[in-house]
């Protein structure tokens, strides 16, 4: 476009700015003042002469025309792209309808007492409140930091439901394969599914208007790790849940929010519309359970920390010395506990000696050094060896982004292509081609962001 002041150029910049804010920063909307400011920066970046630059008035005038013609949606002082506004508006409407739909409160006292005896558990007042609330409303939320007994509450809810409805159907879901497997293991239920699998979705926002919606056939749906759910996935979830299905959303509001746009869990908690039970008593009280306490202190803004067997602070003057000490600690712990039970976390991927990529290479040379060319494969500037600890970085049908495993073998097929055998636990023993290794990283060390929702017995952070 030759005319740098044309309405078409300004329109394109406005829409680009909104999409950039969504995809890079997770914003569903921008305040009008911010949108004008960011759009001007984009429009005027290639114009060095101040007198020739686009003025704020021009952007504001074009914005008004875009709002009039539906190219941008204005809600109060906030501006949305029509697609994103539709997602939020649709989700809010479905939640409001669910809350307005009077759910029959069930008397659970007899069932709850029976469950206490069968599971051999004693529930705190807050835990009992969470269980009761789940059977009094169509939509409820349970939150709490690590160690506050969320899993015990889920077990109790499931058992009370089975006691009340022997032929009833319930479904457990979580955003990732890793979280769903952990949910099934911790509750003792045969199956928990990913949201995408349970809802019949792909891995992205490719659901068309005419595509058939698969409804979830369940009387009770429990979703764990709901803080990871973005606005698009929340819309797809509520679209597929029947109005008479009880829904329990569970999560830690202090965990990192969803990668996609929209902080749905936080907004639901603070809306004042959804019944919320906050579990705030830490039950892990052993001398080896200090991490849960320290996480609570940090969330509360306290500088107090407990130190002991499972929480140690090691002072180090430089990154080089830090990297050396991390390697020494890792090798000692891995020798005692096994590599699968030790994990290094770093806030950086590439920057500095203590970044995860540098630590991965250094650690690997100590715990899994070169043996023979037959036992390693080079992909670009990366090398993988038999016995390497690895992490999957992209969701597939069998493994999820963040899943950890080991390389168990490297072979060559009849065409001379190198194939890598991976073991991610259970029946997930897979063979990778060189192309598929693009979505695999060494995982002796990883970034704190990548590690969100993973577990290891020992962590060097």
Residues covered by each model-derived region:
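Accessory, non-ATPase domains that flank or precede helicase/AAA+ motor cores in DNA-metabolism machines
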Residues: 1-107
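N-terminal pre-P-loop "Q-motif" helix
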Residues: 121-133
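Conserved helicase motor core of P-loop NTPases
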Residues: 133, 250-398, 408-410
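Pre-Walker A (Motif I) flank of P-loop NTPase domains
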Residues: 136-140
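Conserved helicase motor core of SF1/SF2 NTP-dependent helicases
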Residues: 141, 152, 156, 160, ...
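The conserved Walker
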Residues: 146
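Conserved glycine(s) of the Walker
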Residues: 149
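Conserved small/polar residues in nucleotide/adenosyl-binding loops
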Residues: 452, 456-459
